[in-house]
Amino acid sequence: MTRLRRLLVTDRIFFVTSNLLHGHSPLWDREFDLLIDVFKAVRQQLGFALCGYVFMPDHWHALIWPQFPLTISRVLKEIKEVSTDLLNQQRRVEGNIWQPRFWDRFVRNKKEFNERLEYMHLNPVRKGWVVRPQDWRWSSHNNFSLDPLIVGACPIQVDYIHLSDDYRG
């Protein structure tokens, strides 16, 4: 059985998921902070829009919009390579940390964008890590607060975009 082929598509918003390899110990505070630094650095380097994210102990989700000619595969490759190197240094281990592939889906409209964003932000609540999504430090939830002091304290500032009701990229 062959693995799924990935289309080389750009100029779309993608909902992506990347999982730790089976058997790796979960990520926690210091490692989440490291992932935040990686996302900021890779976004600065490659120039993609980050519209939302959540880091969980065994996986992460993000809404990423790579600008032409950048592809989602290139973005994920860079995030995973840089984070693997830094996490391995911190853990004093070698080898892959992330599963080699990732899951992605085009976001087709504003409704779907908001559903994916809500899914990400409620993930820590569903898993029982916090009672309210705003209490999970490692997500973009607080970027969408109406209080500018809360937004200013967010570890990653997300890119705010305007989508029409019938966005198709």
Residue ranges, per PLM feature:
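Short catalytic/metal-binding and nucleic-acid-binding patches
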Residues: 1-169
